[in-house]
A protein has these predicted regions:
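Membrane-embedded catalytic interface detector for glycan/lipid assembly enzymes
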Residues: 2-5, 80-206, 210-219, 241-253, ...
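Membrane-interface helix-loop-helix junctions at transmembrane boundaries of multi-pass membrane enzymes
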Residues: 24-30, 167-180, 350-361
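N-terminal "leader" segments that precede or initiate the main folded domain
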Residues: 1-90, 178-189, 205-209, 213-245, ...
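Hydrophobic, aromatic-rich transmembrane alpha-helices
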Residues: 14-23, 158-173, 338-352, 405
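Hydrophobic alpha-helical transmembrane segments
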Residues: 3-20, 41-52, 97-103, 175-185, ...
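Small-residue-enriched transmembrane helix-hairpin modules in multi-pass membrane proteins
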Residues: 130-150, 232-348
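Membrane-interface micro-motifs in multi-pass membrane enzymes
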Residues: 2-8, 61, 146-159, 197-201, ...
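Hydrophobic alpha-helical segments
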Residues: 317-410
Length: 410
């Protein structure tokens, strides 16, 4: 093995240093947990790069790309340290008559999204041919109906429903029907991911539900604490089973299934760190000018499905390279720095807010984002996604404008 392959170890060592530099780790438990999660993922990536875990990755370690990668990830992670303080804050009540109508509208949107996604899930295809689903998506990605667009718009409100569930558990704990319905609605993103045999939505949801428990536990009653723990156990168990089934089917169909299932799992967890240097070295200026992830801002789109069919490269392009790698591949190094700074600014803004329902919504969105950063950036800023964010911001302003001085609306 060449000496430079040991450069991969810079990843976990760097995250370990950040972890120990974080004082009062008991106070910043979730932030410390995020750092450890990144350290674990990068350690697996290091083992892939060193050949200890034998999988097919674009192994091309270079010092400058690795240092760039680490700095960008840490810049994105640091704002989450300020979020931990909200666990020790009381969720502020909303004194607006618009709360109930907003809740019912979110429930309706999420149920419409789930219904549309269930209709599009081809169980037989998932059980026999995962790859063909992706090919079909590429062929039909522009030929979608209004219902499909509306379902895509609705799925972004799953975590809004989860934040609302937290609010009702605190201020209306006896409204069990609404709370349970909101928890069901929070699964909208999971159903959206199952359309194409996606695994990341399942794992992401379990992570977000854990975050939800972390912040809600100090303020909700014993009944909902126990219920939430039970729900987390059920969701986690289902996620592991579905994740394993989809992984087996995908690799067995493509002829790449190794006899060791654990190897495939490790590959999923750490390949982004093993792949980044090659992406950085071969595509420093990007290939799509932002069209892969930010089409609404750059005015054109570029398909992220079956990239090797549209880009001539010896690298395997449909592999993880973490979110930073996805942005470098899409828009180039300098644009990636700019995007990272924008995200950090927005995340710091949320950390300076008062702890209310909308702060919780924005936090859940950003926690979903930072978890996705381990793999790739699949949160494409389409018009539907942008409008869904803008709509929540407008609703927040309307609630502030229509607030009343009476007790919170319950």
């Amino acid at each position: 093995m060449e000496y430079n392959y040991y450069l991969y170890l810079i990843y976990p060592i760097s995250f370990l240093i950040v972890f120990f530099l974080c004082k009062n780790r008991n106070k910043y438990r979730l932030f410390s947990g995020l750092i450890l999660l990144y350290m674990a993922s990068s350690f697996v990536g290091s083992m892939i790069g060193l050949g200890v875990i034998d999988v097919n990755a674009n192994k091309e370690p270079k010092l400058i790309p690795i240092l760039f990668h680490i700095v960008m990830l840490i810049v994105l992670l640091l704002p989450f340290k300020s979020y931990d303080k909200f666990r020790y804050s009381k969720l502020k009540p909303i004194n607006s008559p618009l709360l109930r109508p907003f809740t019912y509208l979110i429930i309706i949107f999420c149920l419409i999204g789930i219904y549309g996604d269930i209709q599009n899930i081809n169980v037989n295809a998932i059980m026999t041919d995962i790859v063909s689903i992706r090919d079909e998506l590429q062929e039909n990605e522009k030929a979608v109906s209004f219902t499909d667009h509306f379902s895509f718009f609705c799925k972004h409100y799953g975590y809004v429903a989860l934040a609302l569930a937290y609010y009702y558990m605190k201020y209306s704990p006896k409204d069990k029907f609404t709370i349970v319905l909101l928890i069901i609605c929070s699964l909208s993103s999971v159903f959206a991911g199952l359309q194409n045999g996606g695994r990341e939505y399942l794992i992401k949801y379990v992570f977000i539900y854990f975050v939800f428990l972390y912040y809600s536990k100090p303020e909700i009653d014993t009944y909902w604490k126990k219920t939430n723990r039970s729900i987390l156990i059920v969701f986690s168990s289902l996620a592991v089973v579905v994740f394993a089934v989809i992984t087996v089917l995908r690799f067995s169909y493509s002829g790449q299934m190794d006899s060791n299932m654990v190897t495939a799992m490790f590959n999923y967890m750490g390949q982004g760190f093993a792949n980044f240097s090659a992406i950085f070295n071969h595509f420093p200026d990007g290939v799509a000018g932002g069209g892969m992830h930010f089409p609404i801002f750059v005015g054109h789109s570029f398909s992220v499905i079956n990239l090797n069919q549209s880009i001539n490269s010896s690298l395997s392009l449909n592999t993880f390279s973490t979110t930073i790698g996805s942005w470098v591949f899409d828009a180039g190094i300098y644009a990636t720095v700019f995007i990272v700074l924008i995200y950090q600014t927005l995340m710091r803004y949320v950390g300076r807010r008062k702890f209310d329902l909308f702060t919780m919504i924005y936090m859940l969105w950003f926690y979903e984002f930072i978890f996705s950063c381990l793999f790739f950036h699949n949160q494409i800023f389409s018009l539907a996604r942008l409008l869904s964010f803008v709509a929540i911001f407008i609703v927040e302003q309307l609630m502030k404008a229509n607030s009343v001085t009476a007790k919170s609306i319950r």
